[in-house]
């Protein structure tokens, strides 16, 4: 994931920052508790495509 692109992207739900998880190929929104997939290097920032994060994944 291009770091410059990552700096521009925000969560479509909360407008907060996203953190890239290289291992899982996801963009994480801690405030929305969602993980957006990255497919073929392209972020899919659709709420309907995101998965809900567990407390364990959020470190809670």
UniProtKB/Swiss-Prot annotation:
- InterPro entries from the UniProt entry: Trm112-like (IPR005651)
Q: Which Gene3D superfamilies match?
A: 2.20.25.10
- Tell me a GO cellular component: cytosol
Tell me which domain of life the UniProt entry assigns to the organism this sequence originates from: Bacteria
Q: Tell me the first and last residues of the signal peptide.
A: none
Q: Disulfide connectivity?
A: none
Name the SUPFAM superfamilies on file.
Trm112p-like
Q: Record's family?
A: Belongs to the UPF0434 family.
Q: What is this protein called?
A: UPF0434 protein Bpro_2950
Taxonomic source organism: Polaromonas sp. (strain JS666 / ATCC BAA-500)
């Amino acid at each position: 994931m291009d770091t410059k692109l990552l700096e521009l992207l925000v969560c479509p739900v909360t407008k907060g920052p996203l953190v890239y998880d290289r291992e899982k190929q996801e963009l994480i929104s801690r405030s929305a508790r969602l993980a957006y997939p990255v497919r073929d290097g392209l972020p899919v920032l659709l709420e309907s495509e995101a998965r809900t994060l567990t407390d364990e994944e959020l470190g809670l």
